[in-house]
From Swiss-Prot:
Name of this chain's protein: Glucose-1-phosphate adenylyltransferase
Keyword Disulfide bond among record annotations: no
GO biological process, one term: glycogen biosynthetic process
Pathway: Glycan biosynthesis; glycogen biosynthesis
Catalysed reactions listed for this entry: alpha-D-glucose 1-phosphate + ATP + H(+) = ADP-alpha-D-glucose + diphosphate
EC number annotated for this UniProt entry: 2.7.7.27
Role of this protein: Involved in the biosynthesis of ADP-glucose, a building block required for the elongation reactions to produce glycogen. Catalyzes the reaction between ATP and alpha-D-glucose 1-phosphate (G1P) to produce pyrophosphate and ADP-Glc.
Pfam families (alphabetical): Hexapep_GlmU, NTP_transferase
HAMAP family reported for this sequence: GlgC (MF_00624)
Highest rank taxon of the organism: Bacteria
Residue sites binding alpha-D-glucose 1-phosphate per the record: 98, 163, 178-179, 189
Record text on subunit structure and interactions: Homotetramer.
């Protein structure tokens, strides 16, 4: 079977990332100094020789759609094939919103027909990993499967966060449960599937006509295939690097893994490059007397202070006498002089004044949303302005577009938060 079409699910809201995803879809979140999350899935496609790609957008699609454009950075600006943005649409039977992952693909069966799909690769646009999809496809064809799911073993205490499967000795999936409270296995789905098109079309039409379905692959379609013995599903075990950066802690950790002496995720492999759409900027500048250690510093950055174990994105400016430790500083953020920042995530275009201390003090639970803002990280939303001489504790959150007038005093205790005042 030949023609493979990739469908990238890129409509996720990413609520566990808090202020980072209030204005952008999760796949558009910046990562690794210059990329956005979707770049890794798109690059995996073209590195695997897959040039027919649909990107299914939904929540806050503007930044993502602008980033992808016509696909030129990924060599996807093609007359035959290429990349196409596929938002929800109003049709005879469709709503104007994807009802679930399965419904999103169902609404675009016509796109698959137009591209003469024989195999359909269904991918998530918000994970960090490098995978040659041909290995998955070859395994799928070898097993003569109707569908194949990429998976990996995870610690059993984390298994309830994933779709969990049980297989026989031949790798055939015999049971699947989405995010079970008491997992019976630690073999977790990576949200990467390949299906024979005609089989997929049949089960999606049946699922769409099921009034009791939530139209989700993990919750509905896959369990039903197994329960009703509609076809054969196999598990493809992946042993490479894969991260779900769906929480602030996991996002921060995955970024800082990039600066390890031997990083588990290799951005520098000449045989498996990652492509992105990025602004042209001059080389990074590190001023005399500054110190940069165990960090990524991207083009356009100007460092006049000291940076340790951090990821510094494009166009960031760090003032004299400032120390940045264990932090992620996103594009065009500006940090003034004589500041101290530790264990912080600073979003795009934030301006921090002089003599600001952030990520210091006692540990405390966050008062805004302790389930989202945890792990003792302080997070600042895009376009915010932090005034001079502020002392901001651990586990704090500064909302999007916060200004100096929104701060009641020069001290923000650990666990506290500031959001913009309503007009």
């Amino acid at each position: 079977m030949g023609n493979t079409v990739a469908m990238i699910l890129a409509g996720g809201q990413g609520t566990r990332l808090g202020v980072l995803t209030e204005r952008v879809a999760k796949p558009a979140i910046p990562f690794g100094g210059k990329y956005r999350l979707i770049d890794f899935t798109l690059s995996n496609c073209v590195n695997s020789g897959i040039y027919r790609v649909g990107v299914l957008t939904q929540y806050r699609p503007h930044v993502l759609s602008k980033h992808i454009g016509i696909g030129r950075p990924w060599d996807l600006d093609r007359k035959d094939g290429g990349v196409e943005i596929l938002p929800p649409y109003v049709g005879r039977h469709e709503s104007d919103w994807y009802k679930g992952t399965a419904n999103a693909v169902y609404q675009n069966l016509e796109f698959l027909e137009e591209n003469d799909a024989e195999l359909v690769l269904i991918l998530s646009g918000d994970h960090v990993y490098a995978m040659n999809y041909n290995d998955l496809i070859d395994y799928h064809l070898l097993k003569e499967a109707d569908g194949t799911i990429a998976c990996m073993e995870v610690p059993i205490e984390e298994a309830s966060r994933f779709g969990i499967m049980i297989t026989n000795v031949d790798g055939k999936i015999v049971d699947f449960e989405e995010k079970p409270a008491k997992p019976r296995s630690n073999l977790a789905s990576l949200g990467i599937y390949v299906f024979n098109y005609e089989f997929l079309k049949k089960v999606l039409i049946e699922d769409e006509n099921d009034p009791n379905s939530s139209h989700d692959f993990g919750k509905d379609v896959i369990p039903r295939i197994l329960r009703e013995n509609l076809g054969s599903l196999y598990a493809f075990r992946f042993d490479g690097y894969w991260r779900d950066v769906g929480t602030l802690r996991s996002y921060w950790e995955a970024n800082l893994e990039l600066v390890l002496p031997v990083p588990p995720f290799n951005l520098y492999d000449p045989n498996w490059r990652f492509f992105t759409h990025t602004e042209e900027m001059p080389p990074a500048y590190v001023a005399p007397g500054s110190k940069v250690s165990t960090s990524l510093v991207s083009e356009g950055a100007e460092v006049y202070g000291n940076v340790f174990n951090s990821v510094i994105f494009q166009g960031v400016k760090i003032g004299r006498g400032t120390v940045v430790k264990n932090s992620v500083i996103m594009t065009r953020a500006e940090i003034g002089e004589n500041c101290y920042l530790e264990n912080v995530i600073i979003a795009e275009s934030v301006k921090i004044g002089n003599n600001v201390r952030m990520g210091v003090g006692e540990d405390a639970e966050n008062k805004l949303d302790p389930k989202v803002y945890s792990g003792l990280l302080t997070v600042v939303g895009m376009n915010s302005v932090i005034p001079d001489d502020m002392v901001i504790g651990k586990n704090c959150v500064i909302g999007i577009g916060v200004g100096p007038e929104d701060f009641k005093s020069k001290t923000l205790e650990s666990g506290d938060y500031v959001i913009p005042r309503e007009e």
